[in-house]
Each structure stands twice: as C-alpha cells, then as structure tokens.
Amino acid sequence: DTSPAHAGSDRIAEAIRYMNRHLFEELSVQEVAASVALSSSHFSRQFKAKTGYPPYEYIILRRIDKAKYLLTSTQLSVKEIAYATGYNSEENFIHSFRSNVGIAPGLFRKHPI
C-alpha cells in the first residue's frame, strides 16, 4: 500500500523504533521528527493520532515503565535509575515519576502499585 495514510503510518512506526533505540538518551521531538523526514508539528499530530499520546509523553511513559521495572527488580539507587532511564538529574526524575505514578520512586520500590 503506497497511500499517504499508509506512508504516514510507516513513518510513525519508524519513529517509534527510533525512540525505542534512543529512549534513554537525550531525545527531542525535533530529533525524532527529523529522523523520519517530517516537521515537528506534522509529526506530533500524526504521532498522537496513531498512538493517542503526544511524542514527548510517550517518551516519558516508556522511561517511567523502565524505572518501575528497575525499582522493583534491582538494588540500583534512585539516582542511578534516573540516569539509566534518560533523566539528566535525580530531581527531574523524581518529579516526573511522582507526576506520572502518584508516589515517589522510593515509596514505589517499597510498595509497588
């Protein structure tokens, strides 16, 4: 199928693969959009239409999922998990985790929800 809708869907699938490969690195929506030859605004609209999430929220949610796994399956410190999941500081990680999960990472480790 070479329809524009199919081509757009292929680009979003490729963007998701790109995001997953670079998830724990510094990653911007502009960089992901450029990787599939789309403008940031067009990419963001297409991505949300296909996934239900804006691109940056998708990145955050994937990072939080990985952090939950690391918190419950390793003895890594919260700081180590912050850096391992692509955050540039422990404070940013804690804020993001609390905003998305509802509790702090340390408490999640003790009482996973």
Specify the residue positions occupied by each region the protein language model found.
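Basic/polar phosphate-binding segments, predominantly the helix-turn-helix DNA-binding elements
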Residues: 14, 18-62, 76, 82-107, ...
